[in-house]
Amino acid sequence: MNRIAFITLGCKLNYAETSTYERALLKEGFEAVSWTKGADVFLVNTCTVTEHSDKKSRNIIRKLHRQNPDSLIFVTGCYAQLKKAEIEAIEGVTAVFGATEKSQIVPSILAKVRDQEYCPEGAGRFFPAYSSGERTRSFLKVQDGCDYKCHYCTVPYARGESRNIPIAEIIPQAEAIASEGIKEIVLTGVNTGDFGRTTGETFFDLIKELNKVEGIERYRISSIEPNLLTEEMIDWITSGTKFLPHYHIPLQSGCDTILREMGRRYDTAAFAHKIQYIRERTEVPGGPKVFFGIDVIVGFPGETDELFMETYTFLRDVVRPAFIHIFPYSRRAGTPAAERKDQVQDCKKTLRVQMLEELSAQLHAEFLESNKGVSEQVLFESTDRKGMMEGYTGNYIRISRPFDPAMIGKIVDVII
């Protein structure tokens, strides 16, 4: 019984943690296989950002048991933290691990497979993790948890309070990633920019130290709250560091009324200023444009057609991102927004999602057009898709070329 399959749902942070479990279990003699081909052990890392995420997790667990009735199924992740009893009630589940029990997962799997007893000595406050196995990019977990408690979100309850390990313990992880020949690191967390709560350090301190790691040539920040991305930080990032002109920033709404009711910590004027500040300090005539990926929630309680159009107009005329990541509001038990009586009809949410998807496609096409003829650097990846390989520019434009194994992991100058 040594074949194990990993199923990861949700964010890049989950992928980093799953990769860490995988490395530890491979060292113990396990063989990683595709979950579609059957395995002796399954580890499902769940997501709970929406009700759809919960349902998807349940369906996968049931499917695994139906297709592999004699296999062991272990479940972790945010859904496992919030609804542990609900998952334990699903037929075929061997064990469920919440947010504070991640350090117990590997020893528990080993004990079960080897028919041994395992007595946990206590849960760790922070579970270090980074992804590996790819030759070009790694996701490095630098922070966990969130203290913001926005009115629609259950993630703070699933992930716990904001916490991290010291910079001095993160740098060796980045060095280990570099030793594998990986050139790019994506910094991940639940509220990444809130790094330092438990160590008296700051996210700015962290990125300045990471910038010194030899062998890593590119960094991306997976997501950062606009109020935590300071002008001082932007000035440093744009001064010739290894950090790329690629920003993933949650807006959630382009309407100040809705932002206040969501419990967000900025208004549209502050957000617009931050976007403009980045552009002014990054973009030069004839050079690459900054990639902005923006998160937006549609259909938050109380969002009328007029208030939604404020968001639409703000995105179209002011922010003009390269990509909009759109979420229809999902009613999550235990949050203030779930108790409101002015819920928006699903049909209206669907229409608003469609409108923003069309806008996102238009803005992305314009972003690509604005970068045509520009010189950029591409890090090519190992995937062979029908004789082609792909890579990404610093500002996250996908570039394809005929597959050449010698180009894997190489950073190459191209004209877009």
Question: What are these model-derived regions, one by one?
Answer:
Residues 1-194, 208, 232, 268-286, ...:
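Proteins enriched for Cys/Gly/acidic motifs involved in redox and nucleic-acid/cofactor modification
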Residues 37-38, 147, 252-254, 384-386, ...:
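Short strand-connecting beta-turns/loops that link adjacent beta-strands
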Residues 170, 187, 221, 249, ...:
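Conserved, mostly hydrophobic/aromatic
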Residues 339-416:
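Terminal RNA-binding accessory module
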